[in-house]
């Protein structure tokens, strides 16, 4: 199971999944904060 087209030894789909999860999490926190009122100061 040697993936040649990967950056280092981490598969690209793992990087994509982690990046997508982080982006969705940040957007969720930002929108939640804006609804509560804490995000208005940002």
UniProtKB/Swiss-Prot annotation:
HAMAP family linked to this entry: PSII_PsbJ
Q: Name one GO biological process term.
A: photosynthesis
Q: Which family does it belong to?
A: Belongs to the PsbJ family.
Residue ranges spanning the membrane: these are 10-30
The residue range of the signal peptide is: none
Which compartments does it reside in?
Plastid, Chloroplast thylakoid membrane
The gene designation is psbJ
According to its UniProt record, where is this protein mainly located? plastid
Query: Which protein are we looking at?
Result: Photosystem II reaction center protein J
Q: Tell me, what does this protein do in biology?
A: One of the components of the core complex of photosystem II (PSII). PSII is a light-driven water:plastoquinone oxidoreductase that uses light energy to abstract electrons from H(2)O, generating O(2) and a proton gradient subsequently used for ATP formation. It consists of a core antenna complex that captures photons, and an electron transfer chain that converts photonic excitation into a charge separation.
Q: Which GO terms describe its cellular component?
A: chloroplast thylakoid membrane; photosystem II reaction center
Pfam families according to UniProt: PsbJ
State the superkingdom.
Answer: Eukaryota
Q: How does it sit in the membrane?
A: Single-pass membrane protein
Q: Which UniProt keywords apply?
A: Chloroplast, Membrane, Photosynthesis, Photosystem II, Plastid, Reaction center, Thylakoid, Transmembrane, Transmembrane helix
Q: How does it assemble?
A: PSII is composed of 1 copy each of membrane proteins PsbA, PsbB, PsbC, PsbD, PsbE, PsbF, PsbH, PsbI, PsbJ, PsbK, PsbL, PsbM, PsbT, PsbX, PsbY, PsbZ, Psb30/Ycf12, at least 3 peripheral proteins of the oxygen-evolving complex and a large number of cofactors. It forms dimeric complexes.
